[in-house]
């Protein structure tokens, strides 16, 4: 006689912590498309959030701070090794590069204002500089991307730091993809591309293929900016 208390196979599969209905649906979609899925907004998988950010104490490398009577400073200085004008942040967090197009003009301006209020920096992201964002940013990174969309040496000279885009967590190993619905006339003009169609960026930079080439490219930007600003990698 069958044990009526034993879970059925359907129940066991339904409780799988790995192959959830969402994961199975994603597999089916990829099988039908024959490639990875592309959409705007964010990743499908859960990612770390602010509540999971933790700083490890350096109790052996320096004296600890008595929190109830001493002030803890979070000031961070970047680029002091090579740059004549290192960038100073009040907190060790900055607004990473998100392009105009992926974000609206209002969103870019709001992030710039918020970063300035917090004493930190924001980044141009892909597609070049938009003047309102730069105007509201007290500290601003100019991003050099694989496609060179919107790249302007004159805008680079207005930056407090330069950032080479190599990869990002949302699309590891893949290039950029801006959906056609977001490619307005203004976005298209900045990138010198047609409006209303998807815009793709290559997965790697066209003028360097390894560490030696990257070193030369960094040196090129240092000389172009007269060693004034820091250079970092994303």
Task: State each model region's role.
Residues 122, 140-142, 231:
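Hydrophobic/aromatic residues located in beta-strands of well-ordered beta-sheets
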Residues 1-93, 97, 102-116, 120-121, ...:
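Conserved, well-structured core domains of diverse proteins
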Residues 113, 128-129, 134-136, 148-234:
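Alpha/beta enzyme core
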């Amino acid at each position: 006689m069958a044990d009526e208390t034993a879970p059925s196979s359907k129940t066991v599969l339904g409780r799988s912590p790995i192959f959830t209905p969402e994961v199975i649906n994603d597999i089916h979609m990829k099988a039908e498309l024959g490639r990875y899925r592309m959409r705007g907004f964010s990743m499908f998988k859960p990612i770390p959030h602010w509540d999971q950010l933790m700083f490890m104490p350096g109790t052996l490398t320096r004296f600890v701070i008595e929190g109830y009577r001493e002030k803890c400073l979070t000031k961070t200085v970047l680029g002091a090794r090579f740059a004549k004008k290192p960038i100073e942040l009040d907190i060790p967090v900055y607004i990473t590069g998100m392009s105009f197009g992926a974000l609206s003009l209002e969103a870019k301006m709001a992030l710039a204002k918020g970063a300035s209020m917090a004493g930190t920096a924001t980044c141009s992201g892909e597609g070049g500089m938009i003047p309102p964002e730069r105007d509201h940013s007290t500290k601003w990174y100019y991003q050099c991307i694989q496609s060179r969309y919107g790249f302007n040496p004159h805008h680079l000279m207005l930056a407090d730091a330069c950032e080479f885009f190599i990869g990002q967590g949302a699309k590891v190993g893949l290039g950029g993809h801006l959906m056609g619905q977001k490619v307005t006339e203004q976005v298209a003009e900045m990138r010198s591309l047609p409006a209303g169609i998807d815009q793709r960026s290559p997965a790697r930079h066209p003028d360097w293929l390894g560490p030696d080439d990257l070193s030369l490219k960094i040196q090129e930007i240092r000389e172009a900016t007269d060693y004034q600003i820091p250079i970092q990698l994303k």
